[in-house]
Amino acid sequence: MAENQYYGTGRRKSSAARVFLKPGSGKIVINQRSLEVYFGRETARMVVNQPLELVDMVTKFDMYITVKGGGISGQAGAIRHGITRALMEYDESLRGELRKAGFVTRDAREVERKKVGLRKARRRPQFSKR
């Protein structure tokens, strides 16, 4: 492994991302594909880049990311969380700025389970008076 590599694990919904930061030119590889190929949606790409843009390090690191589980937005959120943790491993003084933006906290919201007798988690069957 490289001598100056920084690692961060990120999670969101049912997605988990492993992020490896290496000094470089700003290349982002997700599951052996580029950011543009992996995320078709512009919003997902923006979410991934948010912590790097905040601390002005977009072109300072190359990133190698593996992400599993969940959907597009969950995976993007997990990657953002992992990048944030890796940046904090690189430089702990960035923590305050990243926390203020809300990237350090793991978003604990999960899908609510479906209950017996209901159609979804909270949606009740239609009530008929007669």
UniProtKB/Swiss-Prot annotation:
PROSITE patterns: RIBOSOMAL_S9 (PS00360). Keywords: Ribonucleoprotein, Ribosomal protein. The keyword Ribosomal protein applies. It comes from Yersinia enterocolitica serotype O:8 / biotype 1B (strain NCTC 13174 / 8081). InterPro entries: Ribosomal_Su5_D2-typ_SF, Ribosomal_uS9, Ribosomal_uS9_bac/plastid, Ribosomal_uS9_CS, Ribsml_uS5_D2-typ_fold_subgr. One of its GO terms (biological process) is translation. The keyword Ribosomal protein applies. It comes from the Bacteria. HAMAP family: Ribosomal_uS9_B. Belongs to the universal ribosomal protein uS9 family. GO terms for cellular component: cytosolic small ribosomal subunit. GO terms for molecular function: RNA binding; structural constituent of ribosome. This is Small ribosomal subunit protein uS9. Pfam families: Ribosomal_S9.
